[in-house]
Amino acid sequence: MKIFLDTANLEEIKTAADWGVIDGVTTNPTLVAKENVPFEKRIKEICEIVKGPVSAEVTALNWNEMIEEAKKLAEIDKHVVIKIPMTKDGLKATKVLSEENIAVNMTLIFSSAQALLAMKAGARYVSPFVGRLDDISSDGMKLIEEIVQIIENYDFRAEIIVASVRHPMHIVHAALIGADIVTVPFKVLQSMFNHPLTDIGIDRFMKDWKDYQNRTK
């Protein structure tokens, strides 16, 4: 399974890239706004660090304007993927862009019906939001299972990007289901490292090594 980082912060991206565990990056207008830098400049900077898919979201709501904005973003770097919200205009724009071989990540997906429409329109990626579904007492991971099954049934070429990931168990569950990709905030990625038995083991090894050195002086 691929892991994308859900951020527009360069330091977070550089750190995760140095760990060798990320395959791409997803951004959205909210994440970019936190950085107080020009949008296109930041997307270009991210592409220079990560040689994998980098999702950049359009802000237009009309399909014509979405296409115009998407084409400008696609010119930034060959790795840019256009992020488009799941709307009727978004579907129309996705159809046009996919026919021109511009990769689309259809976002804000909350049902298997929406995912099916996105894939029919030609989306390269579909991004179901598991955490937000869990927030309203729905089952986010059940949605992932359904989309995986639809892709298997009809051999769609789209990949699932599990989004709105809140904790490591979301990631593990997605991997067990067979999702292609998870996109995670930096703090969630960091929490994947943690296990109390690992810390206890390191402390014990270091204590034993120090005792050994003291005995053999």
Curated annotation (Swiss-Prot):
Enzyme Commission numbers on file: 2.2.1.2
Pfam families: TAL_FSA
Sorted UniProt keywords: Cytoplasm, Pentose shunt, Schiff base, Transferase
InterPro entries found in the cross-reference section: Aldolase_TIM, TAL/FSA, Transaldolase_3B, Transaldolase_3B/F6P_aldolase, Transaldolase_AS, TSA/FSA_arc/bac
Primary enzyme class: transferase
Enzyme active site: K83 (schiff-base intermediate with substrate)
Swiss-Prot/TrEMBL catalytic activity: D-sedoheptulose 7-phosphate + D-glyceraldehyde 3-phosphate = D-erythrose 4-phosphate + beta-D-fructose 6-phosphate
Disulphide bridges: none
Main location: cytoplasm
GO MF term (any one): transaldolase activity
Gene Ontology cellular component annotations, sorted alphabetically: cytoplasm
Cell compartments where the protein resides: Cytoplasm
Keyword flag Cytoplasm: yes
Pathway recorded for this protein: Carbohydrate degradation; pentose phosphate pathway; D-glyceraldehyde 3-phosphate and beta-D-fructose 6-phosphate from D-ribose 5-phosphate and D-xylulose 5-phosphate (non-oxidative stage): step 2/3
GO BP terms in the entry: carbohydrate metabolic process; pentose-phosphate shunt
Task of the protein: Transaldolase is important for the balance of metabolites in the pentose-phosphate pathway.
Family: Belongs to the transaldolase family. Type 3B subfamily.
Matches recorded under PANTHER family: FRUCTOSE-6-PHOSPHATE ALDOLASE 1-RELATED, TRANSALDOLASE
Official protein name in the record: Probable transaldolase
Organism whose genome encodes this protein: Pseudothermotoga lettingae (strain ATCC BAA-301 / DSM 14385 / NBRC 107922 / TMO) (Thermotoga lettingae)
Organism placement in taxonomy: Bacteria, Thermotogati, Thermotogota, Thermotogae, Thermotogales
Gene name as annotated: tal
